[in-house]
Amino acid sequence: MDISKMDRYAAPVHFSSLPLLATVLCGVGLLLLAAFTMLQVTSTKYNRNVFKELFIAATSSIFLGFGSVFLLLWVGIYV
């Protein structure tokens, strides 16, 4: 296996778009986290909807997770 004949690896996301992706994904995740917190504080135990809570929490978790990955890539920690 000759390394010089292999194709060079190209990242699926261009490095110049990492700051925008990190900022947008973390921002959306934090907004959903705030919405989830407001939902928990303002609802009583009689009008809570567990599916709505799980949907908002899972969506926020996904956005914050991907935002954290892009943030780490942006600062040079290649995970």
UniProtKB/Swiss-Prot annotation:
Keyword check for Nucleus: no
Pathway: Protein modification; protein glycosylation
Keywords: Membrane, Transmembrane, Transmembrane helix
Protein name: Dolichyl-diphosphooligosaccharide--protein glycosyltransferase subunit TMEM258
Record GO terms (molecular function): oligosaccharyltransferase complex binding
GO annotations of cellular component type: cytoplasm; endoplasmic reticulum membrane; membrane; oligosaccharyltransferase complex
InterPro entries reported for this sequence: TMEM258/Ost5
Gene name for this UniProt entry: tmem-258
GO biological process terms held by the UniProt record: protein glycosylation; response to endoplasmic reticulum stress
Organism lineage: Eukaryota, Metazoa, Ecdysozoa, Nematoda, Chromadorea
Transmembrane regions: 18-38, 55-75
Assembly and oligomerization: Component of the oligosaccharyltransferase (OST) complex.
UniProt xrefs under Pfam families: Ost5
Membrane topology value: Multi-pass membrane protein
Subcellular location field: Membrane
